[in-house]
């Protein structure tokens, strides 16, 4: 399991009792799991009164590092002993390791389901449709009469056999920029396949 130096520093800061006391550590750990597993989770978990004494930059850094480590552990289906070994290397004490492992075991199935739903392949664009929209703003100060485009990309997701649509609105300049970038990407792919 490879983690960046930035993530490792965040995990080591989380292990430091001077930075995070026991209750702050438990709250941050639960917040990291909640932010990953609950789509409706808000940032209020980091606004808990027991976390107010911690610098917000350090708090967010450690929250992100914990979430990254949890995702990596779930991705590699790490067992308790491997998890413990890594946390010991990051200077975690026995109590924090136990809490981390317990929280991980309690959420392991949900985490694996979440990671499995993400898929292994990027969606493929199968079709595109567009229509012209005309934007008119009637205001004494600003008058905007310009065309806009509503673009819908039909994509195919190979892993889930679903066919979702991606819709967006753009100006003529943005659409020309998108078409130019797609042409460049197509040419790059053609060159790569000819090598």
From Swiss-Prot:
CDD domains (alphabetical): Commd3 (cd04751)
COMM domain sequence ranges: 124-193
KW Cytoplasm (keyword) present: yes
Cellular localization per UniProt: Cytoplasm; Nucleus
Reported tissue expression: Expressed in kidney collecting duct cells and in the nuclei of proximal convoluted tubule cells in the kidney cortex (at protein level).
Pfam families xref list: COMM_domain (PF07258), COMM_HN (PF21672)
Keyword entries, A-Z: Cytoplasm, Ion transport, Nucleus, Sodium, Sodium transport, Transcription, Transcription regulation, Transport, Ubl conjugation pathway
Chain coiled-coil ranges: none
GO cellular component: cytoplasm; nucleus
BP GO terms, sorted: sodium ion transport
UniProt superkingdom: Eukaryota
Family note: Belongs to the COMM domain-containing protein 3 family.
Function: Scaffold protein in the commander complex that is essential for endosomal recycling of transmembrane cargos; the commander complex is composed of the CCC subcomplex and the retriever subcomplex. May modulate activity of cullin-RING E3 ubiquitin ligase (CRL) complexes. May down-regulate activation of NF-kappa-B. Modulates Na(+) transport in epithelial cells by regulation of apical cell surface expression of amiloride-sensitive sodium channel (ENaC) subunits.
Record text on subunit structure and interactions: Component of the commander complex consisting of the CCC subcomplex and the retriever subcomplex. Component of the CCC (COMMD/CCDC22/CCDC93) subcomplex consisting of COMMD1, COMMD2, COMMD3, COMMD4, COMMD5, COMMD6, COMMD7, COMMD8, COMMD9, COMMD10, CCDC22 and CCDC93; within the complex forms a heterodimer with COMMD2. Interacts with NFKB1/p105. Interacts with CCDC22, CCDC93, SCNN1B, CUL3, CUL4A, CUL4B, CUL5.
Protein name, per record: COMM domain-containing protein 3
Organism of origin: Rattus norvegicus
Lineage, highest ranks first: Eukaryota, Metazoa, Chordata, Craniata, Vertebrata
Gene: Commd3
């Amino acid at each position: 399991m490879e983690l960046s130096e930035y993530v490792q520093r965040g995990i080591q800061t989380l292990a430091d009792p001077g930075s995070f006391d026991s209750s702050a550590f438990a709250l941050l750990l639960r917040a990291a799991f909640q932010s990953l597993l609950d789509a409706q989770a808000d940032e209020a978990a980091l606004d808990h009164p027991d976390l107010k004494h911690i610098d917000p930059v350090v708090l967010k850094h450690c929250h992100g590092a914990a979430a990254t480590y949890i995702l990596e552990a779930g991705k590699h289906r790490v067992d308790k002993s491997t998890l413990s070994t890594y946390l010991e290397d990051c200077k975690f004490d026995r109590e924090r390791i136990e809490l981390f492992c317990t929280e991980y075991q309690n959420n392991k199935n949900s985490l694996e389901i979440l990671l499995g739903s993400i898929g292994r392949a990027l969606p493929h664009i199968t079709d595109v449709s567009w229509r012209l929209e005309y934007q008119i703003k009637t205001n004494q100060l600003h008058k905007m009469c310009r065309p806009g485009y509503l673009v819908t990309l039909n994509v195919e997701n190979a892993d889930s056999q679903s066919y979702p649509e991606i819709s967006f609105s753009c100006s003529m300049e943005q659409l020309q920029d998108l078409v130019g970038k797609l042409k460049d990407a197509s040419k790059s792919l053609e060159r790569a396949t000819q090598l």
